[in-house]
Amino acid sequence: MLGRALRPGWLGITRTVVKKPSCGSYFNRTFQTAINTTMPPMQEGMLSTMMMMTATATRITGTVSEPLNGSNIVMQLDSVMRKRKKKMKKHKLRKRRKREKAERRKLSQGR
């Protein structure tokens, strides 16, 4: 739930991501060449994960520093919760009907 809230695209905040071209493809490409020439595969994997971590960290700090109205986030989360509740209700109802139908079938077969 929170992961979705922290993802900038989901909240409609895309400007902060565009502002930082350092985590773009050009940066990755230069990094890749440096890795391939100097490191064995295991360290390469570790480095890529570190890079990912730093990229996400910068993105999150970017979104936090930007003034965004908290009510909007709350509204979106609220709607998500409402949707989930509705789905659950529907699911439970369907399950109950199925069970009742199965019971009726058993009763009719027993006769």
From Swiss-Prot:
Compartment annotation: Mitochondrion; Mitochondrion inner membrane
The organism's place on the tree of life at top rank: Eukaryota
Record protein name field: Small ribosomal subunit protein mS38
Transmembrane parts of this sequence: none
GO biological process: mitochondrial ribosome assembly; mitochondrial translation; mitochondrial translational initiation; mRNA processing
Keywords: Membrane, Mitochondrion, Mitochondrion inner membrane, mRNA processing, Ribonucleoprotein, Ribosomal protein
UniProt GO molecular function: structural constituent of ribosome
GN (gene name): QRI5
Lipid bilayer topology: Peripheral membrane protein
Chain intervals with Basic residues compositional bias: 82-99
Purpose of the protein: Component of the mitochondrial ribosome (mitoribosome), a dedicated translation machinery responsible for the synthesis of mitochondrial genome-encoded proteins, including at least some of the essential transmembrane subunits of the mitochondrial respiratory chain. The mitoribosomes are attached to the mitochondrial inner membrane and translation products are cotranslationally integrated into the membrane. mS38 is also involved in the splicing of the COX1 mRNA.
Assembly with partners or alone: Component of the mitochondrial small ribosomal subunit (mt-SSU). Mature yeast 74S mitochondrial ribosomes consist of a small (37S) and a large (54S) subunit. The 37S small subunit contains a 15S ribosomal RNA (15S mt-rRNA) and 34 different proteins. The 54S large subunit contains a 21S rRNA (21S mt-rRNA) and 46 different proteins.
Protein species of origin: Saccharomyces cerevisiae (strain ATCC 204508 / S288c)
Regions of compositional bias (Basic and acidic residues) in chain numbering: 100-111
Main location per the UniProt record: mitochondrion
GO-annotated cellular components: mitochondrial inner membrane; mitochondrial small ribosomal subunit; mitochondrion
InterPro entries linked to this entry: Ribosomal_mS38_C
